[in-house]
A protein has these predicted regions:
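Catalytic glycan-binding domains that act on GlcNAc-containing polysaccharides
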Residues: 2-217
């Protein structure tokens, strides 16, 4: 499948979802579409919207960092503390607004599915490959990692995270696309993307999507 065909497929299968997600945000639909192409383009080419929505990528370094928090060697990973992790791992529940206080120590025995939950927190999932641990954050609209496999919820979570990047680094969501792509891939506008062509690919795909949208809706 050519790049133009991939963008056309994303437009056909996810165009309305993308437009809905961007409606109350400064994020451009073409940026979100390019993010999907960058993150799950291969899965979208093969399995369409459903295939891309269920894509996952395990991050060993994130698992190690979460384990450090879980064992009390670090106070937190970002805004996620030990109690947040333990509550989710043991019950599958997310603590928000002070609700659902979790245990402060790791119990002697834990359910087997707790290990799967930890693995899921250390994996990216969904159309734009949001890291699972983000669902534990106070501002998240997700109740579990599995929500990231639901396209509409994954895109809303993506919009939230992009807005946080924009606020943290004083970026214009509607204009400063190269640093936003870099933030998404590395966590910082000054990071080094794993794929040297990540930003250039994103910008090119943005233009393809924008041109296609203009042609379909003149």
């Amino acid at each position: 499948m050519t790049e133009a065909e991939l963008i056309a497929k994303i437009h056909a299968e996810a165009g309305e979802l993308i437009a809905d997600a961007c409606r109350s945000s400064s994020v451009k639909p073409e940026f979100l579409a390019a993010l999907i192409a960058n993150e799950t383009g291969a899965q979208f080419s093969e399995g369409g919207l459903l295939g891309a929505s269920h894509a996952r990528r395990f991050e060993k370094a994130v698992l190690a960092a979460l384990w450090e928090v879980l064992m009390g060697r670090k106070a937190a990973y970002g805004s996620i503390g030990r109690k947040d992790l333990l509550l989710y791992l043991l019950s599958g529940k997310v603590a928000r607004d002070g609700a659902g206080e979790g245990p402060s120590t790791v119990p002697a025995a834990i359910p087997a599915d707790s290990l799967l939950r930890l693995d899921r927190l250390a994996s990216s999932a969904g159309l734009t490959q949001v890291m699972g641990y983000h669902v534990l954050e106070e501002a998240s609209g997700c109740d579990s990692v599995e929500d990231l496999t639901v396209p509409a919820r994954a895109l809303r979570e993506s919009i939230r995270l992009l807005a946080e990047f924009a606020q943290r680094y004083q970026l214009d969501l509607a204009a400063e696309f190269p640093p936003l792509f870099t933030c998404w891939n590395t966590g910082s506008p000054n990071g080094k993307t794993f794929d040297p062509g990540y930003v250039a690919n994103g910008l090119r795909r943005m233009q393809l999507y924008k041109d296609l949208t203009s042609a379909v809706n003149p």
